[in-house]
A protein has these predicted regions:
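Coil-to-beta-strand transition motifs
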Residues: 123-125, 138, 224-228
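Helical (often loop-to-helix) elements that flank the catalytic cores of nucleotide-handling enzymes
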Residues: 106-113, 134-155, 238-251
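Short, glycine/charge-rich beta-strand/loop segments that flank catalytic centers
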Residues: 84-101, 165-169
Length: 369
């Protein structure tokens, strides 16, 4: 049975003090309560009090997803302003110190902090998660296996976290370095079947490693409760249009890989050890790096590889109705990722507060506010 390839998009935002430009907790405001009145369960708190998350409805195509995520951003920007805050889409804050940030009062987060201690408290990061509807569990596993190869390229496009604790880190996605301190992160191994994956999960639960499968935080996973493959590798991009383009790319990749699987032409599987080399390069250099073409056993400029990647998925784009969204990736290759643009502002101004101001402007871009 053909998957639906429906879409769900989650974004995590920063709540900022407009005077200091530092992170500020939204918990003393009505932002979350008002958000739930307007958006119901599409908005929720996250582990730190200066993080707020939104999620789209189940969307039938990328244009429906665009409409939903734009609407969510608009609403959250207005809610932040109404409560004396500024909303920012960035995967790390340029200078905020996690030690100054409080954990949101919730038993689930208390348990994570109890288990992971400093690693959890310092996890002050903001991501983008994209769900693609793949109802057949065996197909979901095969698509997850093959998607692993493309995740470094997807991450490179999304990179948006070059600063940490007021320092230029030298990484385009420092968020990825922070998050890999958690257990059960990074790229997963490949699995021969859904039952093999299920056995892995059951063993972890049986041996008290986890109490539920949502604590498997890989860069891609079959979602334990939804009939989706969830891609979790991305930094949250600055612009909503970048989020839509990346979601469209993930959807098209899943569709292409399913078609290959149906034709008994599964994409070649490379070892996790090799794929992690490319992930490191994406984390470190973003779009400016050279990633490894394992087939050719050579380094290739990332922008060139993404061009080849776009050619690879091009034949499924018309049926998904995602041409406009996919074409925007070419613009992203020209303008650079959010990390590139943050660094450019810092080079020009030498002022991280100006970087925060730029991030706030970009968060609003294209939303007709």
């Amino acid at each position: 049975m053909r998957p639906t390839f429906t879409l769900g998009i989650e974004e995590e935002y920063q709540t900022i003090d407009p005077e200091t430009r530092d992170l500020r907790s939204h918990i003393q405001t009505e932002m979350l309560a008002q958000g739930k009145l307007r958006l119901e369960e599409r908005v929720k708190a996250e582990m730190h009090q200066s993080v707020i998350e939104v999620g789209t409805r189940i969307c039938q195509n990328i244009e429906e997803a665009r409409e939903d995520i734009y609407d969510l951003r608009r609403n959250m920007i207005h809610l932040a302003e109404e409560n004396g805050l500024v909303l920012v889409a960035g995967a790390t804050h340029p200078f905020a110190d996690w030690r100054d940030q409080e954990i949101y009062p919730d038993p689930r987060y208390d348990k994570v902090v109890e288990d992971l201690q400093l690693v959890a408290r310092s996890n002050l990061i903001f991501g983008l998660h994209v769900h693609v509807g793949i109802e057949d569990k065996e197909a979901a596993i095969q698509i997850m296996n093959s998607l692993r190869y493309f995740l470094p390229h997807i991450l490179a496009l999304s990179t948006n976290s070059p600063f940490w604790l007021g320092m230029e880190t030298g990484y385009k996605s420092y968020r990825a370095k922070v998050f890999e301190n958690f257990p059960r992160t990074n790229l997963p191994d490949s699995f021969g079947s859904y039952s093999e994956f299920e056995n892995y999960v059951n063993l972890l639960i049986k041996t008290n490693c986890i109490d539920n499968a949502k604590k498997i935080w890989w860069d891609v996973r079959p979602h334990p409760y939804f009939d989706t493959v969830e891609v979790r590798v991305c930094d949250i991009p600055l612009r909503a249009e970048e989020t839509v383009a990346i979601a469209a790319l993930i959807q098209a990749t899943a569709c292409k890989l399913w078609k290959l699987h149906e034709g008994n032409m599964d994409y070649r599987q490379y070892s996790r050890a090799l794929l992690m080399e490319n992930k490191f390069r994406a984390v470190r250099y973003g779009l400016d790096g050279k990633l490894i073409d394992f087939g050719k056993e050579s380094e290739v400029d990332e922008r060139e590889l993404i061009g080849e990647y776009l050619n690879f998925i091009d034949d499924v784009v018309p049926e998904l109705g995602s041409r406009s969204a996919i074409d925007y990736i070419k613009t992203m290759l020209e303008t650079g990722s959010g990390a590139d643009r943050q660094l450019k502002v810092f080079r020009e101004t030498g002022d991280l507060k100006m970087v925060v101001d730029y991030m706030a402007e970009e968060t609003r871009a294209g939303l007709d506010l």
